[in-house]
From Swiss-Prot:
Subunit details: Homodimer. Interacts with FtsZ.
Gene Ontology terms: cellular component: cell division site; cell septum; cytosol; plasma membrane
Entries under PANTHER family matching the protein: CELL DIVISION PROTEIN ZAPA
Keywords, in A-Z order: Cell cycle, Cell division, Coiled coil, Cytoplasm, Septation
Organism name: Geobacillus thermodenitrificans (strain NG80-2)
Any GO BP annotation: division septum assembly
Role description: Activator of cell division through the inhibition of FtsZ GTPase activity, therefore promoting FtsZ assembly into bundles of protofilaments necessary for the formation of the division Z ring. It is recruited early at mid-cell but it is not essential for cell division.
Protein name listed in UniProt: Cell division protein ZapA
Gene3D superfamilies linked: 6.10.250.790
Principal subcellular localisation of the protein: cytoplasm
Coiled-coil positions: 59-86
SUPFAM superfamilies (alphabetical): Cell division protein ZapA-like
Organism domain of life: Bacteria
Length: 91
């Protein structure tokens, strides 16, 4: 459990109001909400027949896919950096 103070921020995602509670700054929470809202609108334009629950799942799956690709790339670069740094120590 964290003792960090919690922030409550009201946001609107795809026409629905939400109160998000978290330890991030209000600006960060709004940025995340705007990102999700933008993605939902983007996928809605490409898939206009989807209802909101299916659209939300499609959006979540696509965001998770983007995240996992970025994490794999980060892990690959971090491992490369460790190898290169380890090589410098051997000189």
């Amino acid at each position: 459990m964290t003792d960090e103070p919690k922030t409550r921020v009201s946001v609107r995602i795809y026409g629905q109001d939400y109160t998000i509670v978290g330890t991030e700054s209000p600006a960060h929470i709004r940025l995340v909400a705007a990102f999700v809202d933008d993605k939902m609108h983007e996928f809605s334009e490409r898939n206009p027949v989807l209802d909101v629950p299916k659209l939300a799942v499609l959006t979540a799956v696509n965001i998770a896919n983007e995240y996992l690709k970025l994490k794999e790339e980060y892990d690959r670069l971090a491992a490369k950096l460790r190898r290169e740094k380890g090589g410098e120590d051997d000189d």
